[in-house]
Amino acid sequence: MQDELFETEKAPQKNTKNAKNAPKKSFEEHAHSLEQAIDRLNDSNLSLKDGMDLYKTAMQELFLAQKLLENAYLEYEKLQTPDKKA
């Protein structure tokens, strides 16, 4: 099950318009954006195009949140492992 949590797929393509200038989001911010996208995707009045755009955005948020979670787990594991160089 643990492997499933950290299994990542190929990263969705990023929107490069503002990616260089945008500050990095926290895990919580990505999770919140994902929740908002899911809420909007449940809107029955959402057009197909808007739904697809929103889905792509949600997948990007999910991927970035997973990467942050994976990095945090790896850092945790590193802290739990005694330094073998000493």
Swiss-Prot record:
Bidirectionally degrades single-stranded DNA into large acid-insoluble oligonucleotides, which are then degraded further into small acid-soluble oligonucleotides. One of its GO terms (biological process) is DNA catabolic process. Belongs to the XseB family. It is found in: Cytoplasm. Its EC number is 3.1.11.6. Its main location: cytoplasm. Heterooligomer composed of large and small subunits. This is Exodeoxyribonuclease 7 small subunit. It comes from Helicobacter pylori (strain Shi470). Residues 1-26 are annotated as: Disordered. One of its GO terms (molecular function) is exodeoxyribonuclease VII activity. Keywords: Cytoplasm, Exonuclease, Hydrolase, Nuclease. InterPro entries: Exonuc_VII_S (IPR003761), Exonuc_VII_ssu_sf (IPR037004). It is an enzyme of class 3 (hydrolase). It catalyses: Exonucleolytic cleavage in either 5'- to 3'- or 3'- to 5'-direction to yield nucleoside 5'-phosphates. GO terms for cellular component: cytoplasm; exodeoxyribonuclease VII complex. Pfam families: Exonuc_VII_S (PF02609).
